[in-house]
A protein has these predicted regions:
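Sec/Tat signal peptide C-region and signal peptidase I cleavage site
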Residues: 29-33
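Bacterial N-terminal signal peptides
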Residues: 20-28
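Solvent-exposed, charged interface segments at domain starts and junctions
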Residues: 1-2, 20, 109
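Bacterial N-terminal signal peptides that target proteins for export
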Residues: 7-20
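N-terminal amphipathic/basic-hydrophobic helices that include classical n-h-c signal peptides
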Residues: 1-9, 130
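Catalytic glycan-binding domains that act on GlcNAc-containing polysaccharides
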Residues: 34-156
Length: 156
């Protein structure tokens, strides 16, 4: 009887340990995925840093206070893009939302860029990322050619 009880206790302990281990693994994945955008600039295996840095150089020469019409910040983000990011976050059941003032933050601007790429560019196409940043999701190749070449020339 006592051997059987010990076996049952051991099984119970193993099950509890397995559940705890799984919870820790899930928690660590969530922590890594939910970090600051500048620390986690990769979406899947794509490193968007060179693209974002080149876009920043073309859009504002690195000036986070740049203003041109409705576009502001280092990445020249429009209110429409902020709205699109918030729609994506809502669809993902996230409580996070971007404000219009977030456009002046380079880190928040990069977060918005990454969110747009993850949602609208899951194939991680650099060309699509650059052209759509300039011409919108339904960009025209002809209309975005000059911009695309400019950004590509700034990439390191």
């Amino acid at each position: 009887m006592s051997v059987r009880l010990k076996y049952r206790d051991m099984n119970h302990l193993i099950k509890k340990a397995s559940v705890c281990l799984m919870a820790l693994m899930i928690l660590s994945v969530n922590v890594m995925a939910g970090g600051n955008a500048t620390k986690s600039i990769k979406t899947s295996s794509m490193n968007w840093n060179p693209v974002m840095d080149a876009i920043i150089q073309v859009e504002s020469e690195g000036n986070s206070k740049a203003v041109s019409g409705n576009s502001v910040g280092a990445m020249q983000i429009t209110p429409i893009l902020v709205k699109e990011c918030n729609k994506i976050l809502e669809k993902q059941k996230s409580k996070k939302r971007f404000s219009l003032n977030d456009r002046y933050s380079v880190d928040k601007s990069k977060e918005m860029f990454l969110l747009i790429q993850k949602y609208h560019n899951p194939e991680n196409s650099i060309e699509k990322a650059i052209r759509s940043w300039n011409g919108g999701i339904k960009y025209s190749i002809r209309a975005t050619n000059r911009y695309y070449k400019k950004v590509m020339s700034k990439m390191k």
